[in-house]
Amino acid sequence: ILFIGSLLIISSCSKKHERSSITGWEYNNPKNGGFEVKLDYKEQATGPGLMFIEGGAFTMGRTEQDVFADWNNVPKTVTVSSFYLDETEVRNVDYLEYLYCINRVYGQSYPEVSKKALPDTLVWRDKLGYNEPYVLYYLRHPAYQNYPVVGVSWAQANDYCIWRTDRVNERILINEGILKEDPEQIDDNTFNTEAYLVGQYDGIERRLLKNLNPATGEKRRKVRMEDGILLPRY
């Protein structure tokens, strides 16, 4: 037990006083300027409803003998980076949550924002079929709330991803005790990941992180991307 305890103490001390391999200066030392490095970072957390897909490489093109010698499908190795994917399709209830949130925040001052986000329900109409009930009820009726949302354009999908990134990161900061919930957000006084990182949004602060930079004169600071707390953009 004593041996294990000694190893833990030595390990923690070595991490605490780890130095830069290119300058020799200690990390996380306010006496040396306070350059902070997340030494105990393991891996990125998986966002709500996502699953991790490990990347790899595969051969694209001809994989068998070219009998006719056409050489019109030359094989090449393609590398795919690791990425995250939703466990299921985005449901109607998920998109309705998005519509509700942006209407609550921007509906009075910028109603065009809410209108621009509405999916095209007319995609159900077909000359050879009677799909009018889907046009009228598919998006909003509770019977279809767990069905995949349809009629969403590429631009709308990107806006949805930005909104989802902001909501996930805001909840992370609240769960970490850094921010408090603010139900009165409206217009430009709304949490946005990019705005928060560049100092254009503060929110209702609860307890910020310890600041190791003596030049600022502040004991606490906001979260930075280098801290590994916030998730990258969806």
Placement of each model-derived feature along the sequence:
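Short, polar loop/linker segments at the starts of domains and inter-domain junctions
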Residues: R62-V80
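Mature N-terminal segment immediately following signal peptide/propeptide cleavage
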Residues: E43-T63
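C-terminal motif of bacterial Sec signal peptides marking the signal peptidase cleavage site
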Residues: I9-S12
